[in-house]
């Protein structure tokens, strides 16, 4: 590999806003700011280290893909999945966590609801799993119950909230604070 020095504010990603306010708008994210934001969120708020495996189920078109790629800064392993999580079934898709020894799993409330509707119950099966991240919509209180009663009792469940406009999170988890049912744990550092 040949590394080419770049300026702090050189373009890293070009993202497009959703169509909620009209035509999509182009948003350019710089190298330095994006990397600092992601290192803060992944390292301090998510407790990611170089010995961990992170699997965020996302498409390349969602900003969570860019967020996941920044995990490589830590030397962490990223696990990727192509295809529908419902094929062959949601429970079988979820078995990737054990097979690949995933430490941090990222998903959405919609996925957790669909998994719950299958009658899923594998409490404490996942030995490596330390953190579940969820974004795309707020987690409701009952989804916290499902995770802690049917998936793993001692997992860090973090409902996170961010956006394409900042290519990061406004609110997210904190590995040193308790998880409270139905609540996002804290504002991101320096986000007040």
Please tell me what each predicted stretch does.
Residues 1-16, 23, 33, 47-53, ...:
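Conserved pre-ATP/AMP-binding loop-to-beta segment of ANL
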Residues 76, 103-106, 116-181:
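Gly/Ser/Thr-rich phosphate-binding loop
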Residues 1, 98-102, 106-109:
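Structural core segment of the AMP-binding/adenylate-forming
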Residues 14, 27-30, 57-58, 63, ...:
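Generic beta-strand/beta-sheet core signal
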Residues 35-53, 63-103, 118:
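Conserved AMP-binding/adenylation subdomain of ANL enzymes
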Residues 11, 17-20, 42, 54, ...:
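Conserved S/T- and glycine-rich ATP-binding loop of Class I adenylate-forming
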Residues 185-191:
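Short coil-to-beta-strand transition motifs
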Residues 20-24, 35-36, 61-65, 80, ...:
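Flexible loop/turn segments at secondary-structure boundaries
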């Amino acid at each position: 590999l040949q590394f080419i020095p770049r300026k702090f504010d050189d373009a890293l990603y070009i993202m497009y806003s959703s169509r909620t306010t009209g035509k999509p708008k182009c948003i350019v994210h710089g190298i330095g700011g994006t990397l600092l934001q992601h290192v803060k969120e992944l390292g301090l708020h998510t407790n990611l280290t170089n010995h961990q495996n992170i699997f965020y189920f996302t498409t390349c078109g969602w900003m969570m893909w860019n967020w996941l790629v920044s995990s490589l800064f830590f030397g962490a392993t990223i696990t990727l999945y192509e295809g529908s999580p419902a094929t062959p079934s949601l429970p079988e898709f979820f078995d990737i966590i054990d097979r690949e020894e995933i430490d941090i799993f990222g998903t959405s409330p919609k996925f957790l609801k669909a998994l719950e509707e299958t009658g899923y119950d594998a409490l404490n099966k996942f030995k490596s799993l330390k953190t579940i991240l969820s974004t795309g919509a707020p987690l409701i209180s009952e989804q916290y119950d499902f995770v802690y009663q049917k998936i793993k009792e001692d997992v860090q469940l973090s409902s996170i909230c961010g956006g394409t406009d900042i290519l990061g999170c406004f609110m997210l988890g904190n590995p040193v604070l308790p998880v409270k049912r139905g609540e996002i744990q804290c504002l991101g550092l320096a986000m007040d």
